Amino acid sequence: MDHDVAVRTTVASPTAVVAQATTWQEFPRLWGSLLDEVYAFVRAGGTTQTGHNVMLYRDDVPNVEVGVQVAGPFAASGRVIPSELPATRVASTVHRGPYDGLTAAHDAVHAWCAEHGHVLTRTRWEIYGDWREDPDELETEISWELAAPA
């Protein structure tokens, strides 16, 4: 699949998340339980979901935040905390298709940035579009923060 990559400026988007330091080997087994914690909090009236599921990776450890886009600030409860997707310049693409193709989309952003002289930070995130029963119809927005020009 081809991934069109573009540079854009994002606006901050409030989120309700569980933050966790993990490993890349553990993360595929972990993210579902983290998201379940957030949804239990939202269903209990802790905040109002206004957007999609998100995964924010702050670095390569990875230190991750798994959660949902929400209306605004709220009081933390247990491991669910307020956070946000940052307002920043990013290189982004939309992956259309099954989630097992997300690595190719991330690789496409890296390749495009290398070709066009952009330097990436380690901060990146995925915004998962509306659920579709057909995996070929899934859409996931991938954004990588760009380093400030030297």
Please provide the spans of the model-predicted regions.
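A solvent-exposed interaction/effector surface
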Residues: 1-150
